Every structure is written in C-alpha cells, then in structure tokens.
Amino acid sequence: MEEGLQRCFVLHRRPYSESSLILDVFSEEYGRLSIISKGARSKRSNLKGVLQAFTPLLMKWSGKGSMRTLRQAETISLAIPLTGINLYSALYINELVVRVIEQETPYPALFLDYLTALTELAQTKNPEPALRRFELALLSSLGYGVDFLHCAGSGEMVSPEMTYRYREQKGFMASIRHDPLMSFKGDELIAISERRFITPEQLKAAKRFTRIALKPYLGGKPLKSRELFLPRTRSILK
C-alpha cells in the first residue's frame, strides 16, 4: 500500500547497510513511523541534505508492518533555524516523541504542537516556556488528564495564594504542609493550566510537574539528549 504525500518531520536517523538510512518519522496523519530510505547515503542520491531533523517535509512511502519504504521526499521549506541551547532543546523534544508516543498512532494535534514548539524555539532566547508547553501538550495527547483549576478534595476553584499537594491519579489537594517535590502554589497551577508562565517560579513549577508526570512513560532509562547536552544546558534539561 502506498500513501500520498504526507507532512512529516524526521525525528532520528541511523545508517543501515552500506547506503541506506532508517528514519524515525513523525507524520501529521499517521503518527510515528519507521521508514527505510534505500540508497539515501549513496553519492548519487537526490535526498542528500533533505532527510534532516527540523526540516518540514512531504513524504510518500509504501508497505505495511513495522518498517515502511520511502518512495518520495521533498522539502516544504528550509530547516527551522535552531542553534545553541535552542537546538539542544529541540533534540530533547525529538527524543521525547520517540520515547513516549506509540508507533502507528495518529496524533494530528500533537504534530501541530510540535511544529509550534520548534517555531517558538527558533524565535526565543529562553526555551523553557516552549519546552513546558510542549511537554504539557504531549501529556494531554497521551490522555494524562489533570484538573489544575479545582481542588481534588473540595471541588472548589484553586486559590492563587494557597498551597496544594499533588497526588497521582487524584489531583491537587489543599495542604498546609510543604513538600519540595509535590507541593504547588495556586498561581502556579493556574499558570500551568493556561500554559502561560509569567514568573520564574511558575516555570520551575511546570518543569517539576512535567517531570513527575512523564516519569512513568520514560521508565528508568535516562534521556540521551540530557546526557549529551546537560553540561551546556543544565538550567533547561536537568
């Protein structure tokens, strides 16, 4: 079966045999796929410079099962310009998608969130808000439903000044005790819900929450992007 041209991004690529590539691709309509590009590394390949991360692509493939075969690929536009810490942050996002979402499952809304995150990273000096927004979008796509705006105990709206303790599978409970990991101020929960972070404390709280929420999906295996780039991006990816 051969599909028509689909909007895609290459998340990861690795050499295969003498001249081919295996691509981990994020497609708008088909989700994450493994695709082999035969001869892509040969000197005469017309795909040299095309199958790159962060480049908007149109791709066509054929086949079924766990590995498809690339039939056509062309760029929609130039690669999204990412450098320095923003490039490392984008690599982190790519690894999150590879590690967390299942293959062969469509995530059209998350694909647009991914494109938005890359665009934001290309336009900002501080990548943290874009990272937090994408992590929250990813959790939402996975069905990780959390009510940030209501106390799980009373059902009342959270108060910006009050402290709430997060309990997995239950939500946020009003608490007079402070837990460095699980306690959040009401204004932080509101900021997370709106995905709009005004203060450094709100950003730190959002990072804390996404780390807690993503941990079950990532398991005990560390992210390679953190290991590679943590010395240069300690404030962002730790």
UniProtKB/Swiss-Prot annotation:
Keyword DNA repair appears in the UniProt entry: yes
Organism classification: Bacteria, Pseudomonadati, Pseudomonadota, Gammaproteobacteria, Vibrionales
Organism from which the protein derives: Aliivibrio salmonicida (strain LFI1238)
InterPro entries in the cross-refs: ARFGAP/RecO, DNA_rep/recomb_RecO_N, NA-bd_OB-fold, RecO, RecO_C
Family per record: Belongs to the RecO family.
Protein name, as recorded: DNA repair protein RecO
SUPFAM superfamilies recorded: ArfGap/RecO-like zinc finger, Nucleic acid-binding proteins
Keywords, comma-separated and alphabetical: DNA damage, DNA recombination, DNA repair
Transmembrane segments: none
The UniProt record lists the keyword Cytoplasm: no
Biological processes per GO annotation: DNA recombination; double-strand break repair
One Pfam family named in its UniProt record: RecO_C
Biological role: Involved in DNA repair and RecF pathway recombination.
GO CC term, one of those recorded: bacterial nucleoid
